[in-house]
Amino acid sequence: MFMGEYQHTIDSKGRMIVPAKFREGLGEQFVLTRGLDQCLFGYPMSEWKLIEEKLKALPLTKKDARAFTRFFFSGATECELDKQGRINIASPLLNYAKLEKECVVIGVSNRIELWSKEIWEQYVEEQEDSFAEIAENMIGFDI
């Protein structure tokens, strides 16, 4: 399980050190793809295979299913940790998430997320005000 928030930097070659606490859970190879809310999702290969199976089962006749799977899979790339624990983030993914120098890496249960520091801070500020309301709405999900 992934949890926590870590501040990291991206170098001029698009490389970022993956937090040490996340490396074992991700494994030497994992998948990075476009996420929601203008961040990137990172999945261990075992989790990626489960998601892939679920998405392959979506009906091709549904426009939203086609659009989502296209967007999600076309942005996906396999990442491999180097000896320093770094990954090279593909340029299209850097552009999508507006990642430049400062990056926030968070753990969200079965995945990690990479956020632009500026976008993450704005997101947190917006969510703090409505967190109690969101929690109340989640009661129906047996949490």
From Swiss-Prot:
It comes from the Bacteria. It is found in: Cytoplasm, Nucleoid. Residues 5-47, 76-119 form the SpoVT-AbrB domain. Keywords: Cytoplasm, DNA-binding, Repeat, Transcription, Transcription regulation. One of its GO terms (cellular component) is cytoplasm. Its main location: cytoplasm. InterPro entries: MraZ (IPR003444), MraZ_C (IPR035644), MraZ_dom (IPR020603), MraZ_N (IPR035642), MraZ_sf (IPR038619), SpoVT-AbrB_dom (IPR007159), SpoVT-AbrB_sf (IPR037914). GO terms for biological process: negative regulation of DNA-templated transcription initiation. GO terms for molecular function: DNA-binding transcription factor activity; transcription cis-regulatory region binding. Belongs to the MraZ family. Forms oligomers. NCBIfam families: division/cell wall cluster transcriptional repressor MraZ. This is Transcriptional regulator MraZ.
